[in-house]
């Protein structure tokens, strides 16, 4: 019967809690960590301790911020107040920032609506979003949400909730990935790209 030492079993079990990590991958990572020297392991442990102690969210947009800072770097910077981009998670902000195409302000919902599981948007988070819109008075609100059933449900919900605002509400275009042949594109993506076509 296969039985790992307790410390190894515990590590594998913890690694499996990460999204997309099954037993085989967790096992492989655990054995890789066994080959690390003491300094590397202590650095890793310190990083986890700091993550637990220092993680905090910006009270303005709910993105991640460094510990003694009052707001995140995106709210500190002199950014365009005429555009507000609403995302589901802080990770989405960093993905958009890598594209270097958006210079406006952000707001993190914290979750997407799920018609299947019954998950809702936090009422307090929605209240603060409306306050943020009143303060910034943006001309445009961009919904940068996943192209999924949950993303669609959330976009529809937000459009209704924000109908009182004078800002126009738009959603990221959904269409064909660059460099991909029709052979590899599913019919749903192709249909959305076709219906959302732009003048050329």
From Swiss-Prot:
Q: Which GO terms describe its biological process?
A: DNA recombination; DNA repair
Q: What domain of life does the native source organism fall in?
A: Bacteria
Keywords of the record, alphabetical order, are: DNA damage, DNA recombination, DNA repair, Metal-binding, Zinc, Zinc-finger
Kindly give the Pfam families that the UniProt entry links to this protein: RecR_C, RecR_HhH, Toprim_4
SMART domains this protein is in?
A: TOPRIM (SM00493)
List, alphabetically, the PROSITE patterns matched.
Answer: TOPRIM (PS50880)
One GO MF term, please? DNA binding
Question: May I ask which residue range the UniProt record assigns to the signal sequence?
Answer: none
Q: Which family does it belong to?
A: Belongs to the RecR family.
Q: What is this protein called?
A: Recombination protein RecR
Please tell me the species this chain comes from: Chlamydia abortus (strain DSM 27085 / S26/3)
Q: Which gene encodes it?
A: recR
